[in-house]
Amino acid sequence: MKKALVVFSGGQDSTTCAALACREYDEVHAVTFEYNQRHAIELESARAVGQALGLTGHEFIRLGPLLKGTSPLVSDAPLGQYASAAELPAGVEPTFVPGRNILFLTLAANRAFCLGTGDIVIGVCEADFAGYWDCRQVFVEAMARALGEGIYGDANAIRIHTPLMRLTKAETVKLSVEVLGERFEEVLALSHTCYAGVRGGCGRCHACILRDRGFREAGVPDPIWKFRKEPVSL
């Protein structure tokens, strides 16, 4: 029986990865982290999406204030607001939380070991325009080797799958449509991406700008737009 563990935030990317895993594995488990993030509403979305997908198991791990940094996601720093993708800052986005994916993947590997699987799925993407160092394929491969050596004594024992790594946001939208089919609107409407923690998205934070652009470029209305305070169109 094939098992996989998904690092699952309840956002667009991890929802797509979880749906894809459900198609490819017999059992799909997920782990979601609470780290005092500003957008804690994503925890509710993670629970709702997990139930909608019928995940075999779903664990919520409370990290509390363990992760610190200057990122507005885990501090009182102001969250950047932008009118369009053209205004997004170059380099590493200020929302970067140092060590976040290192910690998430380490704990995920621990849980995967307990489940008897070496397959971990995570929705990181190099085309995400945020410049996060821990979303690059070179980082993921290094983590897989280190975790494999540290947990199994075998650098190849843990496989960290990154199905969205080379995809644009528009391509991720199209993949979601393909994988979820008739359930696309139902499931994606439950997802949450906005860093400001606004249901349906604030439309101005880094995450909202990229999600909106991806759906527009794909020519697909985002199911969460119906919750947006201001009307959104393609």
UniProtKB/Swiss-Prot annotation:
Which residues take part in binding ATP? Answer: F8, S9, G10, G11, Q12, D13, S14, T15, T16, C17, A18
- UniProt-listed Pfam families: QueC
Coiled coil located at which positions? Answer: none
Q: Which reaction does it catalyse?
A: 7-carboxy-7-deazaguanine + NH4(+) + ATP = 7-cyano-7-deazaguanine + ADP + phosphate + H2O + H(+)
Free-text comment on the cofactor = Binds 1 zinc ion per subunit.
Q: Which domain of life is it from?
A: Bacteria
Q: Which InterPro entries match?
A: QueC, Rossmann-like_a/b/a_fold
Gene3D superfamilies reported in the protein's UniProt record = HUPs
**UniProt record, GO biological process:** queuosine biosynthetic process
Provide the E.C. number(s) assigned to this enzyme: 6.3.4.20
Cofactor section: Zn(2+)
Q: Note the CDD domains from the entry.
A: QueC-like
Q: Keywords in UniProt for this one?
A: ATP-binding, Ligase, Metal-binding, Nucleotide-binding, Queuosine biosynthesis, Zinc
Q: Name one GO molecular function term.
A: ATP binding
* Residues where Zn(2+) binds: C194, C202, C205, C208
Record-stated family: Belongs to the QueC family.
Functional summary from the UniProt entry:
Catalyzes the ATP-dependent conversion of 7-carboxy-7-deazaguanine (CDG) to 7-cyano-7-deazaguanine (preQ(0)).
Q: What is this protein called?
A: 7-cyano-7-deazaguanine synthase
Cite the source lineage: Bacteria, Bacillati, Cyanobacteriota, Cyanophyceae, Gloeobacterales
Q: Per UniProt, what is the name of the gene that codes for the protein in this document?
A: queC
